[in-house]
Amino acid sequence: MAMAVAQKFNHLLSSLWHVGQKPPQPEPVFTVDRAQVPPLFWKPYIYAGYRPLHQNWCFYFRTLFQRHNEAVNVWTHLLAALALLLRLIGLAASVDFREDPHALPLFFIVLASFTYLSFSAVAHLLQAKSEFWHYSFFFLDYVGVAVYQFGSALAHFYYAIEPSWHDKVQAIFLPTAAFLAWLSCAGSCYNKYSQKPGLLGRIFQEAPSALAYVLDISPVLHRIIVSPLPAEEDPALLYHKCQVVFFLLAAAFFSTVMPESWFPGSCHIFGQGHQVFHVFLVLCTLAQLEAVTLDYQARRGIYEPLHARWPHNFSGLFLLTVASSSLTALLLSQLVRRKLHQKTK
């Protein structure tokens, strides 16, 4: 009898202990199959590793440390952005960015590189929130690319250019570079918004970027062709050659769906062509920054007389590129909001 009373009393205490306690929450599901997300989020030949939509923001930040099909894209550019911050700290110890007017383009290219890398990392991390945020974050990504394009053009024009090429293009180079950077952003945003399939969509996105790259890299290519100095006397040339090779490799993987098309269903986490594109683009950026830094240090006797008088305010053009690209992305985001609102009616 006493034993039965004790057991009932123990059961009562246990029940009281659990009163008011929340039941244990199940672990969130971080990835789902492609069939469980809208077609907007689908990647060719990638059938799993997608993140569910309409979770809270904390969920998507937590996926930074989870396995999903955007994780490598996030980390490649996030780590590179952190490396650039360390590089900038190192440069600040030896370069007087405040007092040396010729150091400003060097600061701009580091800032522009950090901008595109960080915007890209944020876009790939948070774009799965919803259809609206998918569009908006990739529009932000395209703004970063436009800023980087103009920053690259400025650095090449200021430090890498040969006097003979400078004489030919000085009046039009930077304004044209700013226009093409904006056009690249606008074309990419419009292609994303319109979702045009096939060749036409690729033309909207890739043709302006290709034109911008041809102009932006022209001082480097001209110098590689005409430079009489051997590589050991001009070490920046090796880095410039590397950045060209890395960019072309990056462009090849961006424009195709290799290698996932060779192994359908096997590249959910690793091995996607866009991941390889990210890696080569990071290598291109790092090689470019080393080349530009070496040019800043070693070619002052060449670039200082060339830029004694400026036909254009490059700081103003830089800000114009940032502002026009940002406004374009904002406008397209509002068009997306309207389109999605009409779809839900």
Curated annotation (Swiss-Prot):
Query: What's a GO biological-process term for it?
Result: oogenesis
Q: Which residues cross the membrane?
A: 75-95, 103-123, 137-157, 169-189, 244-264, 269-289, 316-336
> Where is the protein situated, by its record's location annotation?
Cell membrane
UniProtKB keywords: Cell membrane, Developmental protein, Differentiation, Lipid-binding, Membrane, Oogenesis, Receptor, Steroid-binding, Transmembrane, Transmembrane helix
rRNA-binding: present as a keyword of the record?
no
In what way does this protein cross or attach to the membrane? Multi-pass membrane protein
Q: GO MF terms on file?
A: steroid binding
A Gene Ontology cellular component where this protein is annotated is: plasma membrane
Give ranges for the Cytoplasmic compartment: 1-74, 124-136, 190-243, 290-315
UniProt KW Nucleotide-binding keyword: no
| Tissue/organ expression | Detected in most adult tissues. Higher expression found in white fat and liver than brown fat and skeletal muscle.
- Pull the Extracellular topological domain ranges from the record: 96-102, 158-168, 265-268, 337-345
Supply the induction statement: Up-regulated in PPAR gamma 1-induced adipogenic liver.
Q: Which family does it belong to?
A: Belongs to the ADIPOR family.
* Function, as annotated: Plasma membrane progesterone (P4) receptor coupled to G proteins. Seems to act through a G(i) mediated pathway. May be involved in oocyte maturation. Involved in neurosteroid inhibition of apoptosis. Also binds dehydroepiandrosterone (DHEA), pregnanolone, pregnenolone and allopregnanolone.
Q: What else is known?
A: Non-classical progesterone receptors involved in extranuclear signaling are classified in 2 groups: the class II progestin and adipoQ receptor (PAQR) family (also called mPRs) (PAQR5, PAQR6, PAQR7, PAQR8 and PAQR9) and the b5-like heme/steroid-binding protein family (also called MAPRs) (PGRMC1, PGRMC2, NENF and CYB5D2).
Alphabetical list of PANTHER family matching this protein: ADIPOR/PROGESTIN RECEPTOR-RELATED, MEMBRANE PROGESTIN RECEPTOR ALPHA
What's the protein name?
Membrane progestin receptor alpha
